[in-house]
């Protein structure tokens, strides 16, 4: 058995590594059956905390639509589906073909979009795709700071920084939890960014931009 307790990683922050090692030591001594039982109990505890005892204001982790949950739990989500509709490498995916075409049609209508890319594995990769489509490394962008609930993929530590973008903050009125439109106009004229991102991980009210 690999002893993860001794497998220290120098690239991980010390306080994070300490937290992991503290709990890993406890799990290391458990049997497979005990680990399985613990996994289910942790899921139950999470659902109780987040679904019953909390009000979640982050839409990305809020209660999922029951219809969407049913679709996600279907076995079609476990199948490899490589290639475009009508030209799949994997057999038995003719229904997935139709679902993908249906989804493209739905998204075009919903967002009035000419093109739809639905195959991204996460929001972080989707944001990276957006950067690649609208900017190039070295370009300037403006985005919400961490204090204004800006997403990590809009920052130097995330996709924007890893892609090589120069990041500037969108002026924000913290008392109103809103964008400062006048200050943004002044800053944008000075910075001249290729892209301005008006989006936060927490949005209590519509942003004041007309």
Walk through the language-model features, giving the residues of each.
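General beta-strand structural signal in soluble alpha/beta enzymes
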Residues: 116-120, 143-144, 197-198
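Conserved PLP-anchoring active-site segment centered on the Schiff-base-forming lysine
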Residues: 135-151
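Short, surface-exposed connector motifs at secondary-structure boundaries
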Residues: 53, 110-114, 189-197
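N-terminal "arm"/small-domain region of PLP-dependent enzymes with the aminotransferase-like
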Residues: 5-87
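PLP-dependent aminotransferase-class I/II
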Residues: 153-198, 203-208
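Gly/Ser/Thr-rich loops at beta-strand to alpha-helix junctions
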Residues: 62-63, 121-125, 148-149, 199-205
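Conserved N-terminal alpha-helix of the aminotransferase class I/II PLP-enzyme fold
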Residues: 80-125
